[in-house]
């Protein structure tokens, strides 16, 4: 998701820092993990490297800006102060990941719906709602991922869940909720094969 990281976080953050003379973006990258299917890899976390001229003020601006830009829960700000490694949690938005089955459904289902059509349907379902927007798709042989960032993963799912009655591609999809509530920080449901019933 490097392109989305660049447009959503990197460029606006660098603009805010440079406007105050507080620093600039010096790099970034992603850590990958091996998925269950052989040969498939997924992003575990993305990072942005920042050079700050004034740690205290620049740090406050960095936290404020990233939170305003919608940093998701689980994000961290790692830095060194007085030769001590520090880490602060940031981000108040929840995540909803929808992994569509890209292998086990009937061939005619894949023929009828492409990822562009699916993206447009997801966008329409959320239009005018302050709950989130779809990002993706990210495609592997086994699954296709669309992910959403917003104040409530539950509310996002409430808006897109009715689409399963219209699009059979929702059958057997995995839906992963990443929430602020530490008791239910990450939960997963599986939409049944008879998702249209």
Where are the regions a protein language model picked out?
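Structured core of small recognition/catalytic domains
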Residues: 130-193
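Short amphipathic alpha-helices in soluble, non-transmembrane regions
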Residues: 9-15, 58-69, 158-165
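Surface-exposed beta-loop interaction hotspot
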Residues: 66-120
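Short, surface-exposed beta-strand/loop "edge" segments at domain boundaries and coil↔beta transitions
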Residues: 2-6, 85-87, 104-109, 155-157, ...
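Surface-exposed, low-hydrophobicity interaction/linker segments
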Residues: 2-33, 100-131
């Amino acid at each position: 998701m490097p392109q989305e990281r660049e447009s959503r976080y990197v460029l606006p953050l660098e603009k805010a820092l440079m406007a105050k003379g507080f620093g600039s973006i010096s790099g970034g990258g992603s850590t990958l993990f091996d998925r269950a299917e052989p040969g498939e890899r997924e992003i575990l976390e993305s990072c942005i490297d920042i050079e700050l001229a004034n740690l205290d003020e620049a740090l406050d601006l960095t936290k404020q800006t990233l939170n305003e830009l919608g940093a998701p829960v689980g994000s961290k700000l790692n830095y060194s102060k007085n030769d001590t490694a520090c880490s602060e949690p940031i981000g108040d938005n929840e995540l909803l990941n929808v992994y569509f089955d890209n292998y086990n459904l009937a061939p005619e289902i894949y023929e009828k719906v492409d990822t562009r059509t699916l993206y447009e349907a997801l966008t329409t379902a959320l239009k005018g709602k302050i709950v989130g927007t779809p990002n993706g798709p990210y495609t592997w042989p086994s699954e296709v991922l669309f992910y959403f960032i917003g104040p409530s993963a539950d509310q996002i799912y409430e808006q897109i869940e009715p689409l399963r009655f219209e699009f059979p591609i929702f059958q057997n999809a995995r839906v992963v909720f990443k929430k602020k509530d530490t008791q239910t920080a990450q939960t997963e449901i599986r939409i049944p094969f008879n998702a249209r019933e």
